[in-house]
Amino acid sequence: MPRIVIVGAGLSGLCTAHYLVKSLSEAGKEAEILLLEAEGAPGGKMRTIRQDGFQMEWGPNGFLTNKPHGMELVKDLGIEGRLARSSDLARKRFILSDGTLHRLPETPPAFFRSKLLSLPGRLRIVWEPFASGPPPGVDESLGEFARRRLGTEALEKLIDPMVTGIFAGDPDMMSLRSCFPLIYDLERKYGGLVRGMLGVRRERAQQGMKGEMSAGPGGVLMSFDHGVQTLTDALAGRLSEGLHLCVSVDRIERRGEAYALSMSAGGRREEMAADVVVIAAPAYAAAGMVSPVDEGLSAALRAIPYSPITVAALGYEKATMGNPLDGFGFLIPGGEKRKILGALWDSSIFPNRAPEGKALLRVMVGGVRAPELAALPEAELLAMARNELAEILGISDKPVLAKAFFHERGIPQYLVGHGKRLERIDARLAALPGLYLNGNAYRGIALNDCVRESRSAAGRIARTL
């Protein structure tokens, strides 16, 4: 019986194992599936922490229904009854501009009426259908794209905070095609964003789809009553026999047609043979593992950078806050020169995030914009976050809860040239049959993307056995 070893039991590793079991069963095939995790618990960054009645997310806080993959997995696991739908308030998102919070418009007409942009800035967006086309043969940055089609003001006040909220990155460094392939395709298919939105609206109408198309990410934000860890716990529960914790793989070698994994488990050095290896660890960890197999592959993986980010969770008494937190939260353009990237108003987004009469916020610090701030000592960082909230939201009370979660290498950065790097990685893997890479460092950082890529990888592996 062939042995498949998956290294890393975060979302991507757990999903790969889940879909492998399913694909092999449907194909009438058998294999031994082992899942090795260096930490003492599965789930990776999808971790829910509870303290004093507050429920905090260590990393991501949910997934959108604008793509089907997350909901399909939830139904596959039979945990639909545990889902939590975001409040309608979650559609109200804010941008800080000139020291004032402005609601982010959701539709093109609302954009034109918004005071977030100046009149010249709004007129520049109106001119978008007449903007120049994409430069041929160039991996354009998101910043270059936004300046070309929407103007500098839209880049600074809309696109920059959006990239901060998703990647904690710099739009002038991020690849449009790799970060936002749908926008890239929209321009090439329809000749522009406004034409593209009108074209998609016509297609939706022809297909009988109702509802106005939003300029935002679309879909409904979903989580679970007891946090996002519900999903990874459900996946891990299906794989309990094959899941091994506190096993750190540091080296993979080619042995004939198979692979040998060197690892540390319980203080002992061990070696394990495998016919198929799926590395579902971060790119920087994968780089070290594959160095003995292919130094060129290792170098390509090491070249994928990550932005550091710290999440500061702050709980307050609602009665004395002086701010209703009526919305999803706010993001801050770099031009505002603030010390935080933004904040999510978690207890306004989902139920059960704070005890009765209290509110929970999560403040984002660091990113590419200010990596040194993410690494501040916890007490200093929490004090800074409190000061920023006092100046922006008027919340001056001492919090009843204050915790910081530091992610030294938090979010992979799809820089200009990312697509070419993936081509080099794929070419190297083609010469190493039985070795696969999976995770959020390659073709999408969102939960839906990770589920989609895991299912695809499992299908490819099942077909080769």
What does each model-found stretch correspond to?
Residues 21-51:
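Glycine-rich FAD pyrophosphate-binding loop
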Residues 105-109, 324-327, 342-465:
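Conserved flavin/dinucleotide-binding core of flavoenzymes
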Residues 4-6, 33, 435:
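Conserved hydrophobic helix-helix packing surfaces used for dimerization/oligomerization
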Residues 52-134:
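Dinucleotide-binding Rossmann-like beta1-alpha1 core, especially the glycine-rich loop
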Residues 1-12:
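Beta1/beta-strand and adjacent pyrophosphate-binding region of the FAD-binding site
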Residues 12, 41, 284:
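Conserved Rossmann-like nucleotide-cofactor binding loop
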Residues 22, 245-361, 368-375, 379, ...:
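Mid-domain catalytic core of redox enzymes
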Residues 89-92, 124-252, 258, 273:
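Active-site/ligand-binding neighborhood in enzyme catalytic cores
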